[in-house]
Amino acid sequence: ETVSHVALRRIGDSLSLYCALGGISFSIDERNCLIIHAPHFSVKEFVTNDVVELVDSRNFRWIGRYDHVINTGGIKVFPELIEKKIAGLFTRRFFVTSCDDLKWGESVALVIEGEALSLEQEKIFLEKIRAKVNKYEFPRKVLYVQKFKETSSGKVIRNI
């Protein structure tokens, strides 16, 4: 992580805004990625790969990571937003990523930790997902991984 403790957000409310701490302020670059202005740090400006909706110079809503974006037929889809929409359907860990697609370049893939569902269970599960996401966000492929790899800090490594 580039910088820690520059903003706070209410716990448990993924739609609430992040609010700047102290003398911190924010702007965005041409990718809509967050730029942190921190006059009290030795490096005064940090450019991140976090795509945000900037409300004003002190408040933003986090959308996702620029380096995770899926470009499916020219439509940019953020895995983190899909994950928020479908999180309530899961009892096990999962993540959304991209997979190669001959027609669209990339498409959405759902990776689930643990044993594979039966074809019938998977079909029912995908219908529940379809009700929560738009057509560009719908997983075209479901993959199963016995155990997710993690970083030393416990974050899931999101590649397959």
Language model: regions and residue ranges:
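A short, well-structured catalytic beta-strand-centered motif of the EAL phosphodiesterase domain
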Residues: 51, 158-160
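Short, ordered coil/turn segments that flank beta-strands lining enzyme active or ligand-binding pockets
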Residues: 30, 56, 103, 151-152
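General small-molecule cofactor/ligand-binding pocket signal
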Residues: 27, 97, 142-145
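Generic structural signal for well-ordered beta-strand positions
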Residues: 35, 61-63, 151, 156-157
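Conserved AMP-binding/adenylate-forming
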Residues: 1-59, 66-69
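AMP-binding/adenylate-forming catalytic core of the ANL superfamily
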Residues: 44-137
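AMP-binding/adenylate-forming catalytic domain of the ANL superfamily
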Residues: 133-155
